[in-house]
Amino acid sequence: MLLFYHTIARLLTLSIDRVMVWPIAIISALEIPKMSQLFSPLTVKSITLRNRIGVAPMCQYQAIDGVAQAWHMTQLGSKAVGGAGLVITEATAVSPEGRITPSCMGLWNHTQVEALQPITAFIKSQGAVPGVQLAHAGRKGSCAEPWLGGKHLTDAQGGWDIMGPADQPFDDDGVRLWKAPKHMQHNHIEQVQDEFVAAAQRALEAGYELLEIHCAHGYLLHSFLSPLVNTRTDNYGGSLKNRARMLLETTIKIRAAWPQELPLVVRLSMTDWVQGGLSVEDNIEVATWLKAIGVDMIDCSAGGATPAARSAINGGIAQQVGMAADLRQASGLMSMAVGEITQAQQAEDIIAHHQADIVLLARAMLHDPYWPTHAAKELGVEMSQIMPPLHQLFIGR
């Protein structure tokens, strides 16, 4: 208010012929913040995100026996301090056998819950919503960390038996992901579903407010859904509805265990990038089934079912935003867009043009945990709304 009076006093010294520029001068002097769709709040069920910027779930490979470490507090906490509205914890295994590597996160025991509680509490204290992605790696589990080659581990190297809808290895050249998965019987399917439910209950105890089911990138649930992998002839194979049965049954059980007032999200690979694989149209149909059983939002990624998708992914990630828009329009579900979203105006346009409800950033956030703050400045948005009080005081303008 004091600034306003000083501005008026200054303008009163202007000559009469300059009176017509007063409104423009007042607006300029007061530096009224711009309206931004990217920095508008979003309410989903009982939670409200302060903006539409989310941190994509990114494997860190830093857990010990599935237990989060100081690394995770730093990685996840810094993104909340940096201004993100949603911070999603990496693919978190529902069982020891569901991990990608021995260093992956887990939620199959209470020790893991206790390690996550201070992390989610800190994320909330900084104004962000903590989410977690629950996953089972399936035939892409029992691997070395990426910087160690990412190959399947033998038992002597600390590996474990893997499972899938069929007994086909991921790689057929016997070099990288060479292990043949155990063909899952109905009792194995039920066991994994129960593990997802138990992990969801632990996620709630750990303090998470958004839950994402990982059905993408060739991991277990996606491998059931994809005709490139699922060659079963029982009621879990064949038609799209049968191949979706594992995902749908698992989701129904999780929805019953996860509070109705909290959001439930599913990540889908919107295309397999391979002829004869899943298409965008297939996934839109799956999304309508998921909507009917209580899913609130779809996280739209792509690829990963087979080795043939590796090269296609690199050239097609930018198309995922359009897929999120198509799904959003056709299904009526909220969508998350992810993949090569790096620029502030790009993210603003995605939200403003109703292509997605949330943009998820991965590598951009690794490069710059303060990406949201810097984006706000670039877009002319008042930054203090997403900054801690000390930062507001010294660098908030």
Model segments located where?
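Hydrophobic alpha-helical signal peptides and transmembrane signal-/tail-anchor segments
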Residues: 1-4, 10
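Intrinsic-disorder-associated, low-complexity terminal segments enriched in Asp/Asn/His/Tyr and depleted
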Residues: 5-6, 17
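Flavin-dependent oxidoreductase catalytic cores
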Residues: 30-397
